Amino acid sequence: MTQQIKYKRVLLKLSGESLMGSDPFGINHDTIVQTVGEIAEVVKMGVQVGIVVGGGNIFRGVSAQAGSMDRATADYMGMMATVMNALALKDAFETLGIKARVQSALSMQQIAETYARPKAIQYLEEGKVVIFAAGTGNPFFTTDTAAALRGAEMNCDVMLKATNVDGVYTADPKKDSSATRYETITFDEALLKNLKVMDATAFALCRERKLNIVVFGIAKEGSLKRVVTGENEGTLVHC
């Protein structure tokens, strides 16, 4: 029996760190294969998937800036790191027979298309995975904000934030064993409780555009499929 799909078009935010696996930095082969396999499963179900990937496994602009590097320069270096991750994801998808396209917010014509909204939407409608690289193309904006922006531009049904924990908790579950996971929470409640779902700019954009967010753990087998079919997975942040 075909499973009912709750979200037809999604924007998946992947952190660069989620590609490291147990390695201290870089891209872990087994981890990227597992992650792409999870995404490929929902693509085959007919879900249209756009991805914004971070670059923290290779370079973190904020950390470099703290070490006296010019912040704008550091952020541009971070954007380059996201392009490297995007190319790795594209290669992994194509190994599985899933068509994927990389669109970069910075012009790099030899290795990626320059971001163009109509073309990206066309690719999604054709069943291709679209990987958005280089953040927003501007310094001082996080990849969370890029994900919110692309999610709004692509008219996505939901933004899915893949993290290393399986949702939003009352406290850090790694530090507080009594922390409990929220199944659902409103944007206003998350603000009131000062829950760090994502950075303030991204959160405000999602709230304004009424783009709901699901925070979930991508490393948990089958978690993405459960999210897109509307099962109780992760935390739904809603209007």
UniProtKB/Swiss-Prot annotation:
Annotated HAMAP family: PyrH_B
Gene name in the database record: pyrH
Protein name as it appears in the record: Uridylate kinase
Keywords: ATP-binding, Cytoplasm, Kinase, Nucleotide-binding, Pyrimidine biosynthesis, Transferase
Localization of this protein: Cytoplasm
Binding, UMP: 55, 75, 136-143
Pathway it works in: Pyrimidine metabolism; CTP biosynthesis via de novo pathway; UDP from UMP (UMPK route): step 1/1
A GO cellular component annotation in the UniProt record: cytosol
Record family assignment: Belongs to the UMP kinase family.
Top-level lineage group: Bacteria
Annotated control of activity: Inhibited by UTP.
UniProt EC number: 2.7.4.22
UniProt-listed Pfam families: AA_kinase (PF00696)
Catalytic activity: UMP + ATP = UDP + ADP
Function per UniProt: Catalyzes the reversible phosphorylation of UMP to UDP.
Gene3D superfamilies: Acetylglutamate kinase-like
One Gene Ontology molecular-function label: UMP kinase activity
